[in-house]
């Protein structure tokens, strides 16, 4: 199972939110590029970067920081947040992003999803952000009536290989992931990267046992609840 540290960028800083609420912002580091280098030095082979400003505004905002991260690191970089058109997808791949994560666009713009899949294949990941079994979009500010499991099935049928599944009610809480919801999503047969609430090496072991392809770890790393090197040794 691949362990993926998360870097959330807001106002050019590395921050964490709780339950996706922009009012809960905590700044952990002033420079996201230094943070990416730090995780790589500790052994990260892949880093999850979210443009929170982009997710909120509906277009990529922190492209320059993402470019700097790519130039500074050899680790694979996956990027989400505000990716709503072909130009942004093409731009991100052209500067060296390994995976692009489509959230709102995967739901509301099927043509864009199909464009990304036909041009970039498995490097296109869909982010399913769920609250009480229903999908939320636009930086989690809007809730839809779409069921997370139905969306996962639909994505698999379209040709999506990997989904990042986040339970919003768990994100940033350090209460452990929503294992039940993850179990259901795994039943669809897509590769699942778990995100939200991961707070211990025990959580990671359980996710691995369940068959998760990867785990995105955020707040637990930044406050020292999980030691990244120790986690890599165990998982």
UniProtKB/Swiss-Prot annotation:
Intracellular or extracellular location(s): Cytoplasm
Question: According to its UniProt record, which residues of this chain constitute the active site?
Answer: 8 (proton acceptor), 129 (proton donor)
Family annotation (Pfam families): His_biosynth
Q: Which UniProt keywords apply?
A: Amino-acid biosynthesis, Cytoplasm, Histidine biosynthesis, Isomerase
Give the E.C. number(s): 5.3.1.16
Q: Which GO terms describe its cellular component?
A: cytoplasm
Top EC group: isomerase
List the InterPro entries: Aldolase_TIM, His_biosynth, HisA_bact_arch, Isoase_HisA-like, Isoase_HisA-like_bact, RibuloseP-bd_barrel
In Gene Ontology terms, what is a biological process of this protein? L-tryptophan biosynthetic process
Kindly state which reaction or reactions the protein catalyses: 1-(5-phospho-beta-D-ribosyl)-5-[(5-phospho-beta-D-ribosylamino)methylideneamino]imidazole-4-carboxamide = 5-[(5-phospho-1-deoxy-D-ribulos-1-ylimino)methylamino]-1-(5-phospho-beta-D-ribosyl)imidazole-4-carboxamide
Taxonomy, superkingdom: Bacteria
Main location (coarse class): cytoplasm
The molecular function terms of the Gene Ontology recorded here are: 1-(5-phosphoribosyl)-5-[(5-phosphoribosylamino)methylideneamino]imidazole-4-carboxamide isomerase activity
In which pathway does this enzyme or protein participate? Amino-acid biosynthesis; L-histidine biosynthesis; L-histidine from 5-phospho-alpha-D-ribose 1-diphosphate: step 4/9
Asked if Magnesium is a keyword of the record, the answer is no
Q: Which family does it belong to?
A: Belongs to the HisA/HisF family.
Q: Which HAMAP family match?
A: HisA (MF_01014)
The entry's protein name is 1-(5-phosphoribosyl)-5-[(5-phosphoribosylamino)methylideneamino] imidazole-4-carboxamide isomerase
Organism source for this protein?
Thermoanaerobacter sp. (strain X514)
Gene name in the database record:
hisA
């Amino acid at each position: 199972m691949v362990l993926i540290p998360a870097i959330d960028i807001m106002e050019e800083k590395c921050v964490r939110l709780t339950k996706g609420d922009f009012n809960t912002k905590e700044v952990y580091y002033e420079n996201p590029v230094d943070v990416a280098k730090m995780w790589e030095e500790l052994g990260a082979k892949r880093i999850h970067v979210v443009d929170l400003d982009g997710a909120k505004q509906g277009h990529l905002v922190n492209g320059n920081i993402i470019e700097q991260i790519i130039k500074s690191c050899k680790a694979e970089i996956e990027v989400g947040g505000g990716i709503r058109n072909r130009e942004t997808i093409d731009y991100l791949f052209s500067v060296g992003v390994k995976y692009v994560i489509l959230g709102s666009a995967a739901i509301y713009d099927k043509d864009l999803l199909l464009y990304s899949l036909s041009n970039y294949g498995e490097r296109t990941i869909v982010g399913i952000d769920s609250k009480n079994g229903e999908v939320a979009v636009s930086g989690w500010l809007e809730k839809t009536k779409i069921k997370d499991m139905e969306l996962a099935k639909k994505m698999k049928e379209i040709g999506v290989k990997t989904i990042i599944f986040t339970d919003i009610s768990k994100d940033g809480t350090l209460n452990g992931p929503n294992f039940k919801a993850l179990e259901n999503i795994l039943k669809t047969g897509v590769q699942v990267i778990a995100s939200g609430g991961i707070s211990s090496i025990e959580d990671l072991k359980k996710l691995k046992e369940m068959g998760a392809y990867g785990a995105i770890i955020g707040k637990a790393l930044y406050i020292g609840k999980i030691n990244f090197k120790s986690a890599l040794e165990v998982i």
